[in-house]
Structures are given as C-alpha cells and as structure tokens.
Regions:
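Phosphate/nucleotide-binding beta-alpha loop and adjacent structural elements of enzyme active sites
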Residues: 1-224
Length: 224
C-alpha cells in the first residue's frame, strides 16, 4: 500500500521519477519509456493488460482527465485486473482479446504465469516447459469496437500479446491512421515465428503508415 502511494506521488513528476529510478539502477526500461512518453489527460488502450500492472501505472500518469481501456481475455487474470481498478472511474476493462478479426479464438495460457498467454503454441523450450490450459475467448478488432469510437483522441496503444502484435495492429489500422498514437509493444522473434511473420513485416506495416520506429535499448529510445 505504501509503495503504491509513493509511486502515485512520484508519477506527478515523471522526469524526476525517471532520475530516481536511474539512481536505483532500475532495469524496467519499458516503465522508463512510459514515464518519458505519457502525459496527463491522455487516452490509452492497453492490449494484453493481464493482471493490471501497467494499467494501474497508466492511471497514475494520466490523472483524472485521462482514460484507459484495458483488454484481457483470460478470466483469472481479468478478475485480478478488475479488483485492482474497481474504484477508478476513468478505467474501462474488457474481458476480450484483441486481434485482426472479430471471432472466438483459442488461447494457450500457462497456469502459473498468465502473462505468457498466447493465441499460438510457441516452440521455445521455456514456454513449452510451462503447464498450460486452453481457454476460448472472444476477440475483437480495435477498429470495430464501439466503446473506443466514442473517444475523441487515442494517444497511446500498448500491446503485449506474446507474438500476436501484428494481428492487433492490422485490426487497428484505421484507428491508427486517424489518431497517430504512440505505439509501444514487445517484439519477440520466437513468438513472431509462431504467427508466421517477422520484424521486417512490422517495419513495413509502420513504414506504410509513416511512423518512425524506435527500439528500447537499456533506458534509451534508439531510432531504427
């Protein structure tokens, strides 16, 4: 509780908070990137919210005038997410996945680590060593999801879908064209292979939309 209160205070001064985390030699570079990027009042889409770690962090950065829409398809993770943000009036949570089609999809969810849930069974040894359950869940396209169409502006899309990132992006193409949001996501080559695409396909997607691509290296954003 105390840690959460202190972080809420630090988030009022994000650049100062970055400095503190650097002094503490924090290696959570994604968090550093969010601190340097997100502004009060922003509207954020959190795809693959899991148990709400970043959802809750975003709420601290955007303040009361911002809004977060968080998507999590796995019921057990969604329940934890729901409890974590239940008193946040500017946070809307959706128990669905996000993809390039509106349909029911199969998810492979490690029982001990729902954060590694994926719509494909990966071939890497670490992932294969985990005990998994298969869960069927509705998935939606961001472009077709009515609650998002009511937003006047979308400032940031965060994606963590263990390889399905390009599918999410393809289902959000019109939203991206209209809003030109900042997009931050993890890109794992092994996970991409399971979905039959590569880093080059991601680069081509963003080039077609006139985006500048960056890679987080340590605590810096490097143009690529």
């Amino acid at each position: 509780m105390l840690k959460d209160i202190l972080e809420s205070l630090f988030c009022l001064f994000p650049i100062f908070y970055c400095g503190v985390r650097n002094l503490c030699r924090s290696h959570d570079w994604e968090k550093q990137a969010f601190l340097r990027t997100i502004k009060p009042g922003w509207s954020i889409i959190d795809v693959g919210a899991n148990q709400g770690y970043y959802t809750n962090f975003f709420l601290k950065l955007i303040g009361q005038k911002g809004v977060v829409h968080a998507f999590e398809p796995i019921p057990s993770a969604f329940q934890i997410l729901k409890n974590k943000v239940k008193y946040k009036e500017n946070c809307f949570i959706h128990n669905v996945g996000v993809s390039s089609k509106n349909e029911v999809a199969q998810f492979f969810s490690p029982i001990e680590d729902s954060g590694k849930t994926s719509m494909k069974a990966h071939s890497c040894k670490l992932w294969n060593s985990l005990q998994k359950q298969i869960i069927n869940s509705k998935v939606i396209r961001i472009d077709d999801f009515y609650p998002l169409q009511k937003l006047t502006k979308i400032d940031l899309i965060k994606i963590d879908t263990e390889g399905a990132e390009l599918l999410v992006l393809k289902g959000a193409m019109e939203t991206i064209k209209k809003n030109k949001p900042t997009i931050i996501f993890e890109a794992c080559k092994e996970c991409m292979k399971s979905f039959d695409y590569s880093v080059n396909d991601l680069d081509n997607f963003f080039s077609d939309l006139d985006y500048t691509n960056f890679r987080i290296v340590n605590k810096n954003l490097n143009s690529i």
